[in-house]
Amino acid sequence: MIVYGHRGAKGEAPENTLPGFIHAYRHGIRHFELDVVLSKDGIPVLVHDLTVDRTTGAKGGVCNYTAAELADMDARRNTSSWPRKVGIPTLEQLLDEFDDLEHLQLEVKKDARQRLNILCNRLTEVIQRRDLYQRAAVTSSDPWFLREIRRRDKNIRTGLVAERKFPRPLNIATRLGCEYFCANWKILSRDMVDLAHRRGMHVSTWTVNRIHDMLQLEELGVDSIITDYPTSTRMFFDNRARALLQLPAREAVRGEAEMKMGSDQGFHLSPGEGPA
């Protein structure tokens, strides 16, 4: 199961910041979910909210600040302690930082149509110029935006972000031609996951922070989880995989030891005994 770092590594570092992505990257994370908003000067920047209030010491809408002004803010306000000031980066800065990311979910929040139109153009241009068709999907809970970006380039992969079971988000995703179904983990069922797969969609679920829930979702057949703690989550699944790989060897060693013990005690199979 694929592990996406939520806003970089929201539970481990300042969200949607370069140091947060770098932190997760150094621990082996190559899949990220992040949020894209348009700055005052028309540049896609990485921030979850349409305002800067929650994550910085500043106030007001992201649209009221240039990318340079956003970069100069301190985006540590809503996170655990972090030793150095970190600003709000641009999408291009993130893409320049890494050349081997495997996949990005670029989420776009509902906003004014005029701004979304501009952001749609900017994202299309970035994906085309950097050839991110296979390595990025544009996701949103706004069907209008998903239709618009697909209208600009039918090869851009899209995903519907679904928080509730109604009004039938999987049917909406199907009508939009989405390749990704990005659902709140609490609304998923095996039937829903199976149906999404039959319709050719990758099922990604958010925000999953407990191992118990991750394992249940794995049983449902989800393709990926989005978590605030990607490095510890990745460590858990890597350790489990290594343990499973070592299991046959351990069983073989134990079997050999038991056979040797039986031989030492004079135990042997008589003719006619044993497996048929």
Where are these regions (language model features)?
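Phosphate-group recognition and catalysis centered on beta-loop-alpha active-site segments
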Residues: 1-276
